[in-house]
Regions:
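Membrane-embedded alpha-helical bundles that constitute the cytochrome b-like, heme-associated redox core
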Residues: 1-235
Length: 235
């Protein structure tokens, strides 16, 4: 398995596999968030099911590992590519028309996604699963915070009633869209679907999938923000 870290192809394979796994998680998370638009009780039931249970903790640790590996390999490959280009990267040249904007800016987009992820963890994970986990470990936990841990809808309402968070989340989702549109088909290319016919198909699928996911996430943000405006002073 040393080739996964010692060779450029191996690193790209690791990036691709971890990226696809994260895409699957995004799909699940998107579906879960859409439940909040239909049923507050249903969403809170899902949140309670995904609390500090052993299977949820295993999934959280696995997910964190995927993110960390994906991020490390992303920076590793970027530094490797820059080193390979040497002084050529400073030369002023016309960008090839076949090279997408997202491809040229994947590192910057990735950094925005990481910052957005940190914001998301602070607004949700740190207020939901973390208090339950600390309580189960015997660490003193504020009971009011603990009582709201499984109330996911409350945290969504509280976060997206703030216009600053709404704007930050929409910017984050925009960066995520660009990151996904390139990253998804690029992963498939690295895993062997690199002939012209399949690449074009994967690019189309990537654009459709990325748009659906980002629009659904953005829909939750916008709907709850509009609800907060409608309920202002009356709810």
């Amino acid at each position: 398995f040393m080739w996964l870290s010692n060779s450029s192809i191996g690193r790209k394979v690791v990036m691709s596999v971890t990226g696809i796994a994260l895409v699957l998680f995004l799909t699940f998370h998107m579906a879960m968030n859409l439940v909040a638009l239909v049923s507050a009780n249903g969403y809170n039931m899902v949140c309670e099911f995904l609390g500090a249970n052993w299977y949820a903790l295993v999934a959280t640790v696995g997910l964190a590992a995927l993110f960390i590996i994906h991020i490390i390999y992303a920076f590793w490959l970027t530094m490797q590519n820059r080193k390979a280009r040497g002084n050529e990267r400073y030369a002023v040249v016309d960008k090839p028309k076949t090279v997408e904007w997202a491809s040229q800016n994947m590192l910057v987009l990735g950094i925005i996604v990481i910052v957005g992820l940190g914001l998301h963890l602070v607004n949700f994970w740190a207020k939901m699963q973390l208090p339950e986990l600390m309580h189960n470990m015997g660490v003193h936990t504020d009971m009011l915070t603990l009582s709201y841990a499984a109330n996911g809808v409350y945290h969504i309402q509280n976060t997206f009633s703030n216009p600053v968070f709404v704007v930050l989340y929409l910017v984050w989702l925009g960066a995520l869209w660009f990151h996904l549109t390139h990253g998804f088909w690029s992963s498939m290319q690295s895993l062997g679907w690199n002939n012209k016919v399949w690449i074009n198909r994967w690019k189309c699928i990537s654009n459709i999938y990325s748009t659906i996911v980002v629009v659904c996430f953005a829909l939750v943000v916008v709907v709850f923000f509009i609800k907060s405006l409608m309920c202002s002073g009356a709810c």
